[in-house]
């Protein structure tokens, strides 16, 4: 059973039970919200041309948003790629060259910095996660 299946199961059993809590921000999300919001992120990814099998770099802080995005990536059958945001430029470039991801999800600052990093610059689909989350709210679940 995949984690995404377990989330759907828990959404049915206890939709209003807290699924995640971000200790730093006190942000909480229920199983129902997690399933629905991650489905909307899937719709956003599909509109951006991302599909099953694509490799996506996740370059955002760990928190509720991170897990929503990761859940959407897994639901779509894409591959999540994690790169240490504190790594040096050479390491980041090498990771991107080795993996050849189709997309990157990061902050606006990360996307901007990416124009100066060869490895990130080569990634075709650059997604600002804050804007994505805002826009995804208005989309239908997949």
Question: Where on the chain are the PLM-derived regions?
Answer:
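Hydrophobic alpha-helical segments typical of transmembrane helices
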Residues: 6-7, 91
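AMP-dependent adenylate-forming
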Residues: 7-29
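Conserved hydrophobic/aromatic "anchor" residues
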Residues: 29-31, 70
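Short amphipathic alpha-helical/adjacent loop interface patches that line ligand
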Residues: 38, 42
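Conserved AMP-binding/adenylate-forming
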Residues: 43-87
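Structural core segment of the AMP-binding/adenylate-forming
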Residues: 75-142
């Amino acid at each position: 059973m995949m984690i995404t299946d377990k989330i759907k199961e828990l959404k049915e059993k206890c939709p209003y039970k807290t699924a995640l809590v971000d200790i730093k921000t006190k942000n909480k999300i229920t199983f129902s919200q997690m399933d629905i919001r991650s489905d909307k992120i899937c719709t956003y990814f599909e509109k951006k041309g991302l599909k099953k099998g694509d490799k996506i770099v996740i370059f955002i802080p760990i928190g509720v948003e991170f897990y929503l995005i990761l859940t959407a990536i897994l639901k779509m059958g894409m591959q999540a790629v994690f790169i240490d945001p504190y790594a040096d430029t050479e390491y980041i470039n090498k990771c991107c060259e080795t993996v050849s991801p189709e997309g990157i999800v990061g902050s606006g600052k990360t996307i901007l910095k990416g124009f100066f990093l060869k490895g990130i610059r080569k990634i075709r689909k650059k997604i600002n996660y804050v804007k994505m989350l805002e826009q995804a709210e208005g989309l239908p679940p997949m």
